[in-house]
Regions:
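Acidic (Asp/Glu-rich) catalytic motifs at the cytosolic membrane interface
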Residues: 28-52, 162-184
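Multi-pass membrane catalytic core of lipid/isoprenoid biosynthesis enzymes
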Residues: 49-89, 180-214
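Short, hydrophobic transmembrane alpha-helix segments
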Residues: 3-18, 212
Length: 214
């Protein structure tokens, strides 16, 4: 929505159909990532008594593992169909963007080496929910990418990464006990806190830069 608003503000261009499919793919990526994260914890039996936070649907038995798998597969198919529309609207570059986004969303907690078990979770969020989502959305409306679009993508990506960072910091004791080497676990409290402060300050700083630009 922010990228679409910026495109309209800077160029006066807004295509409602393109905007619909842009927002739909973003929503699908988020749902796939969240559902696979929930399912992945249950499949790996990674839940222990010292974890904080909301209960997971598959762990609690609210959604069966088989139903969750079917739902994720259905969502992936919908995302790929949506990607086909984006390719038609914006060109073949969106084949790479769409497919890589689906893989990243699934791989966060799926596959032999889930991203969630590495220190690269925040970076992945910055790239796909920031740079890729914002610049891609802006490009679909304008067929170009402005400097402000890049700054906005970094700002929103940093905010999204900071949300994940808070979750990882909250769960650092639990994650360490099950072998998850998240950024919070690898850096330790002091360094991680400094990095988190940068994540939260950067959007404000870039916002001032955008506001001051002619």
């Amino acid at each position: 929505i922010a990228a679409l608003s910026l495109a309209l503000f800077e160029t006066g261009r807004f295509d409602a159909l393109t905007a619909f499919f842009t927002m739909t793919i973003a929503l699908l990526m988020q749902i796939i990532s969240n559902m696979k994260n929930d399912l992945g914890y249950t499949e790996k039996k990674a839940e222990t008594g010292n974890r904080r936070g909301l209960p997971r649907a598959t762990t609690q038995g609210w959604i069966s593992i088989s139903a969750a798998r079917r739902a994720i597969l259905t969502l992936i198919v919908l995302a790929l169909l949506n990607t086909a529309v984006l390719i038609w609207l914006g060109g073949w570059v969106f084949a790479l963007i769409g497919i890589s986004s689906v893989i990243a969303a699934y791989s966060y907690m799926g596959g032999p080496k889930p991203i969630a078990y590495t220190p690269f979770g925040e970076t992945t969020v910055l790239v796909f929910f920031g740079l890729t989502a914002v610049c891609g959305s802006y490009y679909l409306q304008t067929f170009t990418v402005s400097a402000n679009a890049v700054l906005l993508s970094i700002s929103l990506g940093s905010i999204a990464a900071a949300v994940l960072a808070v979750n990882n910091w909250r769960d650092r004791v639990h994650d360490k006990s099950i072998g998850r080497q998240t950024l919070a676990v690898v850096l330790g409290d002091k360094t991680f806190t400094a990095v988190f402060r940068i994540m939260t300050a950067l959007p404000l700083a870039l916002g001032l830069v955008m506001a001051a630009a002619p």
